[in-house]
Swiss-Prot record:
Gene3D superfamilies: 3.30.230.10, GHMP kinase, C-terminal domain (3.30.70.890). Keywords: Amino-acid biosynthesis, ATP-binding, Cytoplasm, Kinase, Nucleotide-binding, Threonine biosynthesis, Transferase. It comes from Caldicellulosiruptor bescii (strain ATCC BAA-1888 / DSM 6725 / KCTC 15123 / Z-1320) (Anaerocellum thermophilum). This is Homoserine kinase. It is found in: Cytoplasm. GO terms for biological process: threonine biosynthetic process.
């Protein structure tokens, strides 16, 4: 059996629409082994929305590897242990795709390079901002081109924390993407280019005082926040409590605030405020560090049947 741990991820990070993302220390575990025949899929918790047949996203990701290398198991047993909440903007689908590809590559003897796995994951996901950090960890700036993902990975220091606000409702990425306009104004494109560049500079140099400006966006958040009750309240609460910036995580509905080494004070201020605020949704709150490793294998036993 092969056991793979794959992190959650947050995409866009404000202005970096479809090209920036960071891996977070919240994990799914994928356990796979070859069996004599058939396909057996189990999950914990046992969520009925998770397909238990060939439509399962982890299986589909694994099959892309088998198709690519021309090797197929006789049968598969897949067990999914999920901590990443579904359809909350924290990269649950990217974790399934990147983790499935990573596990399948191990199962077939490591025939694909890391670059090839990164490309397959981004191609299946449609964009690299979640799938690439899920695969390799860290803060990633990436673009998907023909047959290749061009990217830069930055190791995020432990002093930068990610305060994650997770509501008690789901929001599908497809719906949140369809609400976006087909065309944008030139000035809004210029606005985002400047902020995305500033964000990259602020993070890589440690100049976190630039983050309030660098996390502003005009391409997706003004439209998507209409789908998220309490969005402005949560963002304003975060900034008033000392966050360096706050933004929608991926397509939402989760919201992330960036905090520094004073995160314990921030955490207490937020918890006190949440207890007294009049909010439409119920919001879970946790503080996470970046995961700089990405998908990792932590258990390998005998995985292949005699042929």
């Amino acid at each position: 059996m092969i056991s793979v741990k794959v992190p959650a991820s947050s995409a866009n990070l404000g202005a970096g629409f479809d090209c920036m993302g960071v891996a977070l220390k919240l994990y799914n575990i994928i356990e796979v082994e070859e069996i004599e025949k058939g396909l057996i899929i189990t999950s914990s918790p046992d969520d009925p929305s998770i397909a238990k047949d060939e439509n399962n996203l982890v299986f589909r990701a694994m099959k892309t590897v088998f198709d690519e290398v021309g090797w197929y198991p006789r049968g598969l047993r897949i067990n999914l242990i999920n901590e990443i909440p579904l359809t909350r903007g924290l990269g649950s689908s990217a974790a399934c795709i990147s983790g499935g590809i990573y596990a399948a590559n191990l199962l077939c003897g490591g025939k694909l390079s890391e670059e090839e796995m990164i490309y397959l994951a981004a191609k299946m996901e449609g964009h690299p901002d979640n799938s690439t950090p899920a695969m390799i960890g860290g803060l990633v700036f990436a673009v998907l081109e023909d047959k290749k993902v061009n990217y830069i990975k930055f190791v995020v220091p432990a002093r930068l924390k990610f305060a994650v606000f997770i509501p008690d409702f789901q929001l599908s990425t497809e719906y949140a993407r369809n609400i976006l306009p087909k065309y944008i104004e030139f000035k809004d494109a210029v606005f985002n280019i400047g902020r995305a560049t500033l964000f990259a500079s602020a993070i890589t140099t440690g100049n976190y005082e630039l983050l309030p400006a660098a996390t502003q966006d005009r391409l997706h958040q003004p439209y998507r926040k209409k789908l998220i009750p309490d969005f402005d309240k949560i963002v304003n609460l975060s900034l008033e409590a000392g966050a360096k910036g706050a933004f929608l995580s991926g397509a939402g509905p989760s919201i992330i605030a960036l905090v520094d080494e004073n995160y314990e004070i921030f955490e207490q201020n937020v918890k006190n405020a949440l207890a007294s605020m009049d909010l439409v949704a119920n919001w879970d709150f946790m503080i996470l560090e970046a995961d700089n490793s990405g998908a990792t294998v932590f258990s390998v036993q005998s995985t292949s049947l005699k042929r």
